[in-house]
């Protein structure tokens, strides 16, 4: 069944839908979330600015406001995402479906572009996406590549992976390069060990997918990178989306193209 972004958010809010959001509302941008106390917001904004491949900002909320009008007219961040991770002192403490009981007046929402946003363009060009075929979450991996630090925020880059034949990988570079607001072109193609990934069958987030003998692993910078930064910062309290469980926005993907 197809939904408008508003309808999809209502389905999530009412608990009629849950799980990863890849493949839904393909014409509209999806967003990663980082929700932090106001005292850390300036440093985190600088972190995003210094790491634009992994942390391209789509919108920022006002302190204490769960609405981000730039992302959607009827949006309620507290309930419009399928699942959230709650971090305490840099450790993931719990997973929740709603932020109603955790919301505070000092929390600032950062919405960060997601590679799910360009997947519909890839599919329209006939490029198969294995995680959608297998109906699982996209695999995501921690790398050894360091982020540019800002204040307390640092950590290592996280990447998502999609296996493709060489010709499809070339076309994927051409297509995704037009969308820097949702991570843009891949950051690595081929040997995962070169970026510190030991085993593609054991992702740090999401689910493993089949990589066939005639395919290359293609890696994009991932909006889970802020969660690595939150871990390294060891903030007393922070919130993020559960990887793969995104906020669907009202932003048409076509408006994010730069070419």
Swiss-Prot record:
GO terms for molecular function: lyase activity. Gene3D superfamilies: PSTPO5379-like, PSTPO5379-like domain. Keywords: Lyase. Coiled coil: none annotated. InterPro entries: D-Glu_cyclase (IPR009906), Putative_hydro-lyase (IPR038021), UPF0317 (IPR016938). Its EC number is 4.2.1.-. It comes from the Bacteria. Belongs to the D-glutamate cyclase family. HAMAP family: Hydro_lyase. This is Putative hydro-lyase Bphyt_4813. It comes from Paraburkholderia phytofirmans (strain DSM 17436 / LMG 22146 / PsJN) (Burkholderia phytofirmans).
């Amino acid at each position: 069944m197809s939904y408008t972004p508003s309808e999809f958010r209502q389905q999530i809010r009412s608990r009629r839908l849950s799980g990863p959001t890849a493949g839904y509302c393909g014409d509209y941008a999806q967003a990663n979330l980082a929700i932090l106390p106001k005292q850390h917001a300036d440093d985190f904004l600088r972190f995003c600015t210094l790491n634009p491949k992994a942390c391209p900002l789509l919108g920022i909320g006002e302190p204490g406001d769960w609405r981000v009008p730039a992302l959607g007219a009827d949006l309620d961040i507290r309930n419009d995402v399928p699942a959230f991770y709650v971090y305490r002192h840099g450790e993931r403490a719990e997973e929740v479906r709603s932020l109603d009981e955790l919301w505070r007046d000092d929390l600032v929402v950062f919405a960060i572009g997601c590679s799910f946003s360009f997947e519909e363009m890839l599919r329209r060009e006939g490029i198969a996406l294995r995680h959608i075929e297998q109906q699982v979450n996209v695999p995501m991996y921690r790398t050894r590549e360091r982020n540019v630090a800002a204040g307390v925020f640092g950590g290592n880059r996280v990447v998502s992976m999609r296996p493709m034949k060489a010709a499809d990988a070339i076309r994927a570079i051409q297509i995704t390069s037009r969308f820097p607001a949702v991570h843009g072109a891949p950051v690595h193609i081929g040997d995962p060990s070169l970026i510190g990934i030991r085993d593609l069958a054991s992702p740090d987030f999401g689910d493993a997918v089949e990589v066939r003998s005639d395919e290359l692993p293609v890696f994009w910078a991932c909006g889970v990178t802020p969660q690595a930064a939150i871990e390294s910062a060891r903030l007393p309290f922070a919130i993020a989306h559960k990887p793969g469980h995104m906020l669907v926005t009202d932003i048409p993907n076509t408006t994010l193209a730069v070419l």
